[in-house]
């Protein structure tokens, strides 16, 4: 440790003034803990296992990609990782627009009313179902994932309710 760290840090650690966390891994390339830049990976795409993953076209797919990112990060580090669900919020509106288009096409094909109140009610019902399924996917995936080092990912997932604008 003395070769890699300044002498005063080593001394403070040895005297118990500070604690140098994970000093046993310090010299290795592997690192501890990540604040995942989920927003960038979802909005601009990312590469997982040498495969380009484009920006998701729905909330559910964004949730699935999120769990894949968590699995990859967990398999290449030790320690925890953190992300916020607010980065998934823009995909709720993407799904809302996609579902609205589908509902209008279905109702038009069946000769049903395109009254905004009816269309909105159907859209919001389907959207609520997709959001529930997406979050359930994250939950199930995180609970059942096993990394290449034989551990379940250590994840902190923030769910601040006031973090995104109303309606997202």
Predicted regions and their residues:
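Catalytic alpha/beta active-site cores
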Residues: 1-168
